[in-house]
Amino acid sequence: MASDPLSLLKTLTGKTVLVRTQDGFEVEGKLASVDEYMNLSLSDSERTLEDGSKFKLGTLHLKGENLIFISLLSS
C-alpha cells in the first residue's frame, strides 16, 4: 500500500479519475501522469455540463496547487 499521497496518486495512473479544481471546474479522464508537485496530465478527458451534455477536452494538464480533490471512478 502507498505510504504517502503522491505514491497513492501514482498507483492511479491509467485509471479513470474525477478531478475538481479550486474554481469549481470538474473533469474526468484517464490519469496519464503525475509529478512530484502533483501536476496531472489526463487523457481522454471530458467535462459534463449542467444540462448533462458532455464536452470532450482530450489531453488536459492541471497544476497541482489548483486541485481540491481527485477521486477514482473505475478500478
Each model region followed by its residue ranges:
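Conserved RNA-binding domains used in RNP assembly and mRNA/RNA metabolism
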Residues: 1-75
